[in-house]
Amino acid sequence: YKMGNSPKNTLEVIFCPWFNSCSLNSNEKIKQAQSLIEKYKTAWNVLASQLPESHAMASSLLQPKYRIVDESEEITYGDLDNVYIEYLNLCTQYAGMDKKRWKTLIEHLDRYSIDLQKDFFNKLIKKTQSMCDNDKEYLKTKIRYIVYRHRFYNQSDWAMEEDKLMIYENTISAISFNNPIFDYRYLFIKHNMPLLHPIPYK
């Protein structure tokens, strides 16, 4: 079973952007996060788990009773945004050619500004130029489903604005296959074809 005080769980609490349970301020968290991801491959998963909407709960670390400890600093909205941005930048930088890592980042991208989304997708497009068609299809299909879902439920509170969705759609067009057959394989997905312009749900 999963241990609540495992090293991974402890690191997730320490690097949680919106809950400060240690004496590190936001800038120090970012600095330590960079050092961690440079040294350990598994650190990527720790930081990715702290991206917006991916971590719903956090608990404080136990503090020693035999000595005085530094008090944790209050987190401002500016601090929170800065940490989220730097975590995304670090995870993007170290995503490499791993399609599953890129997929994870795509799933959390809607919480970021348009400019950050554009920057992210430009990096993704450049990275896919060295990917095989199967990996490109994997990522393009994921993006397609996001566009489909938000346009199908466009009246929902959580639906993305059309200007953001256009960034996703343009990314799909910009990722090209070596074999043109891959451009049409999404049409044969069973049960739920991810059309870019579905008839909205009413």
Positions of PLM-derived features:
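Non-catalytic all-alpha helical scaffold/repeat segments
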Residues: 1-202
